[in-house]
Amino acid sequence: MKAIMAVGTTSHAGKSFLTAALCRLFNRKGWQVTPFKGQNMALNAYVTAGGGEMGHAQAVQAWAAGTIPRVEMNPILLKPQGNMTSQVIIKGKAVGVTTAVDYYQNYFEQGWQAIKESLAKLSAEFDLVVCEGAGSPAEINLKHRDLTNMRVAKYLDAATILVVDIDRGGAFAHVVGTLELLEPEERALIKGIVINKFRGQKSLLDSGITWLEDYTKIPVLGVLPYSDIFLSAEDSLSLLDRPAQKPKAELNIIVIRLPHIANFTDFDPLCGEATVNVRYLELQESLGDPDGVIIPGSKTTVADLIALNQSGMANQLQAYHQRGGIIFGICGGLQMLGRLILDTDHREGPESEAAGLNLLPLKTVITAEKITRQRQVLSNYPQGGLPVMGYEIHQGISQWESESGYQKMFEEDASLGIVNDSLSIWGCYLHGIFDNGSWRRTWLNHLRQRRGLLSLPTGIANYCEQREITLDNMANLLEEHLNLQPIFAHL
């Protein structure tokens, strides 16, 4: 199997973007393509048809490649959960909790074996693997235990592209410094450099590019302009880079930025609505009176609920509800809307319980079993009979303590979602719910009607179709601005 790899001089250099765009580009050229990231540390996860967890970014890359996401594309997923620990997921299944030091001792060999086995399976079905690195390949203190960057590139003899973010400054120093810190056999794999996120006239870079090529003896494949093309990101640092307020927005929705926020990709479809402003709010900020508030998922629900209470945000949310505000909780957010969360076995952390917001009649117990599965259901609210697809990822069971004044959101399963009779408090376990176009628009119309705004059409496509357009635009950007002949030559 032939291989390409994207590594970056820093985090957020554009590796995920470039990997997804390359997957779509080669898919359009008729290749059977698969993405691959040996080890990913992220709280944005996706659940495959088989019930396995993988990084959401690799799922997007799989769709870019025109194939179905599978756990072999991301055999190791580390999900940080506070106190310097992470949950370890290998081949889609949680196998333990570890610190960074213990991970190298206890999981390194198992992880490398999982990577090799996954690549063997993928090589039997695909012509080309497009790999993504993590962080920087030149972290001297981490290289001996790096399962994601040049170890994989050497194993596959991958044509490797080094991508650098010029928008943050210091791009030439980042490139030269990274190359200087690579071993000779690693540096020999670097077949091209991509300068990413450039604002301005490209000719201003010409002299610098000439110098860089002369000094490194590696071609600069091109300069990608700073683009407003939006692709799901891997971690919450990227929330700082979200697009500015939209001039035509009529609704304002707040997402509470929990300390351990997870699966905030749930809100990408809302960000894609031209009439909706989505703002991520820190716990110390003033809530105000938005049209809706969303409490997202969390990897450590009990700790984040305690933070919600201690910061005063819980009081703000309860006051907002008393004023008639709409609150929607997803997964951990649903659990926080209840009366109590119990973690007596300390599966999430040292805290054994936390009082909820008491806005839904639920009690949640954190359990040993982790539920990961895809779901297809029909809605009861905000309109009956709408098809809804999504997936569950939670380590807790919620029980209704009263049904009076509350309804089930979905026809098939009362435990999947709940809403009060006034349709002001919503909660569900379904990640990806806003990906469903008709359901999303119908829920937004509920908010619009409360503002006296006209309803928008609900017969719209699901978010996956909008994502397809985005992926094609990303591939078009590569075709317009990059010369990939040095990469093709290696293949």
Swiss-Prot record:
<protein>
    <recommendedName>
        <fullName>Cobyric acid synthase</fullName>
    </recommendedName>
</protein>
<dbReference type="InterPro" id="IPR004459">
    <property type="entry name" value="CobQ_synth"/>
</dbReference>
<dbReference type="GO" id="GO:0009236">
    <property type="term" value="P:cobalamin biosynthetic process"/>
</dbReference>
<dbReference type="InterPro" id="IPR033949">
    <property type="entry name" value="CobQ_GATase1"/>
</dbReference>
<dbReference type="GO" id="GO:0003824">
    <property type="term" value="F:catalytic activity"/>
</dbReference>
<dbReference type="Pfam" id="PF01656">
    <property type="entry name" value="CbiA"/>
</dbReference>
<dbReference type="Pfam" id="PF07685">
    <property type="entry name" value="GATase_3"/>
</dbReference>
<dbReference type="InterPro" id="IPR027417">
    <property type="entry name" value="P-loop_NTPase"/>
</dbReference>
<feature type="domain" description="GATase cobBQ-type">
    <location>
        <begin position="250"/>
        <end position="439"/>
    </location>
</feature>
<dbReference type="GO" id="GO:0015420">
    <property type="term" value="F:ABC-type vitamin B12 transporter activity"/>
</dbReference>
<dbReference type="InterPro" id="IPR047045">
    <property type="entry name" value="CobQ_N"/>
</dbReference>
<dbReference type="InterPro" id="IPR002586">
    <property type="entry name" value="CobQ/CobB/MinD/ParA_Nub-bd_dom"/>
</dbReference>
<dbReference type="InterPro" id="IPR011698">
    <property type="entry name" value="GATase_3"/>
</dbReference>
<feature type="active site" description="Nucleophile">
    <location>
        <position position="331"/>
    </location>
</feature>
<comment type="pathway">
    <text>Cofactor biosynthesis; adenosylcobalamin biosynthesis.</text>
</comment>
<comment type="similarity">
    <text>Belongs to the CobB/CobQ family. CobQ subfamily.</text>
</comment>
<dbReference type="InterPro" id="IPR029062">
    <property type="entry name" value="Class_I_gatase-like"/>
</dbReference>
<keyword id="KW-0315">Glutamine amidotransferase</keyword>
<keyword id="KW-0169">Cobalamin biosynthesis</keyword>
<feature type="active site">
    <location>
        <position position="431"/>
    </location>
</feature>
<comment type="function">
    <text>Catalyzes amidations at positions B, D, E, and G on adenosylcobyrinic A,C-diamide. NH(2) groups are provided by glutamine, and one molecule of ATP is hydrogenolyzed for each amidation.</text>
</comment>
